[in-house]
């Protein structure tokens, strides 16, 4: 009961407190003390299940839905912040020092709306290197962690062109999802060879030239 009260108050305070929000300001503007907010923030909370219940009330069950994923850069200075590192900032168009979160949302295609379900902080490159993993491996691990809750909602995951890689697409397929995205600007597309076999020794010809996306050969 006490956690529920603090939880509701915290949501209200996040909407009304101007500028920076921390435990000191929560205690100043709220009815509970700073220590109370600190203690309750250490407790685990299933945000994904909570937001899925909210989505059930907002979106119609018969509507077409898809899962959206999108990493977001957060500006952050300092040296002791866990997993601070260099991440891509879409707004700046460059890699910047700070934090990154992996956002997971639920798209209602018929309502043209999206609701945030979960945000997971991305590990920095040093941590990933020590684990022998890449950032794409981390993204797949996050989706795998929540797949039991996401698959009943939708098997389609929508993402930008960064995720249009074989390793990521295959990883999603192994988890039971399908990726909806666009090809990267540097994609290497090839025509399949449709001619007759030569009968010569060696591996049969598989591809027949590179595709010029600005002038594709429609006869093939």
Residue ranges of predicted features:
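Short, glycine/acidic-rich beta->alpha junctions
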Residues: 18, 47-50, 96, 161-164, ...
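Gly/serine-rich nucleotide phosphate-binding loop at the start of the catalytic core
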Residues: 1-47
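Short loop/turn segments at strand-loop or loop-helix junctions that form parts
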Residues: 69-72, 117-123, 184-185
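Active-site-proximal, Lys/Arg-enriched surface segment
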Residues: 13, 40-112
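Electropositive, glycine- and tryptophan-enriched low-complexity nucleic-acid-binding patches
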Residues: 25, 36-38, 90-153
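Short, conserved acidic/polar surface loops in the N-terminal third of protein domains
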Residues: 77-83, 114-117, 131, 169-170, ...
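An internal, acidic/charged active-site-proximal segment
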Residues: 124-220
């Amino acid at each position: 009961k006490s956690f529920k009260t603090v939880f509701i108050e915290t949501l209200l305070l996040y909407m009304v407190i101007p500028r920076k929000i921390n435990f000191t300001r929560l205690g100043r503007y709220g009815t509970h003390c700073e220590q109370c907010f600190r203690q309750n923030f250490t407790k685990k909370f299933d945000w994904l299940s909570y937001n899925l219940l909210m989505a059930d009330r907002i979106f119609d069950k018969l509507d077409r839905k898809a899962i959206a994923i999108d990493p977001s850069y957060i500006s952050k200075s300092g040296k002791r912040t866990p997993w601070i590192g260099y991440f891509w900032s879409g707004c700046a168009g460059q890699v910047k020092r700070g934090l990154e979160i992996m956002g997971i949302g639920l798209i209602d295609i018929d309502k043209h709306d999206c609701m945030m379900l979960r945000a997971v902080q991305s590990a920095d490159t040093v941590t990933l290197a020590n684990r022998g993993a890449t950032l794409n491996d981390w993204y797949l691990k996050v989706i795998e962690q929540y797949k039991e809750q996401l698959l009943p909602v939708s098997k389609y995951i929508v993402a930008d062109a960064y995720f249009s890689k074989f390793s990521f697409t295959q990883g999603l397929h192994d988890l039971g999802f399908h990726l909806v995205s666009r090809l990267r600007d540097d994609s290497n597309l090839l025509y399949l060879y449709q001619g007759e076999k030569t009968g010569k020794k060696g591996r049969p010809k598989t591809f027949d030239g590179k595709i010029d996306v600005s002038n594709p050969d429609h006869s093939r």
